């Protein structure tokens, strides 16, 4: 197949995912991201779908991001590319028996790359805006969506693995300007 045929097939898959998500009112990241991509396309907003690894569970700490388990978007607005995760913005998984709970989080729209990189690691190196390595990503603590809305930044430690000295652990927080 030619490159044009491959791109056409990929485009058809994205459209099919978007339509299915809209019709069923259900979806996972592929469907959400495809639907957002299609909406952007219809509005004339340049958009991309970015596959990669996510960090959303405690078991992800220390694990290298080798498997693609998530997809999100980049959109070009106001003369720059912005990161968007419509799936994580829509809600969270809760409970012993995993269930999706709608809980809108606007922090996943046009998220600064430095914050986005705490939980998202693009497969394509060209899409990693911070230059973070796979090992650095793996060693990060687990950041929840509420952290993105907080008015502070964790200055130290920058890894999830803490080694206490004399039974003390020092945490430094920077409170951000309002």
Summary of predicted features, one role per range:
Residues 93-178:
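Alpha-helical and coiled-coil interaction segments, frequently adjacent to or embedded
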Residues 31-114:
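Hydrophobic/aromatic-rich core segments of domains that either
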Residues 15, 66-68, 166-168:
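Short, solvent-exposed coil/turn segments
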Residues 1-28, 32-38, 43:
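Secondary-structure boundary elements
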């Amino acid at each position: 197949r030619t490159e044009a045929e491959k791109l056409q097939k990929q485009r058809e898959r994205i459209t099919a995912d978007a339509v299915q998500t809209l019709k069923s009112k259900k979806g996972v990241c592929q469907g959400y991201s495809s639907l957002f991509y299609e909406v952007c396309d219809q509005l004339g907003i340049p958009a991309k779908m970015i596959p990669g690894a996510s960090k959303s569970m405690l078991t992800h700490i220390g694990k290298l991001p080798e498997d693609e388990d998530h997809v999100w978007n980049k959109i070009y607005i106001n003369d720059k590319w912005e990161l968007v995760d419509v799936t994580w913005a829509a809600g969270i998984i809760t409970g012993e028996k995993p269930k999706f709970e709608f809980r809108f989080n606007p922090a996943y729209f046009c998220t600064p790359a430095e914050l986005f990189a705490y939980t998202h690691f693009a497969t394509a190196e060209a899409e990693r805006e911070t230059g973070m390595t796979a090992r650095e990503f793996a060693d990060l603590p687990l950041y929840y969506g509420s952290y993105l809305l907080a008015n502070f930044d964790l200055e130290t430690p920058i890894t999830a693995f803490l080694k206490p000295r004399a039974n003390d652990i020092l945490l430094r927080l920077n409170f951000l300007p309002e």
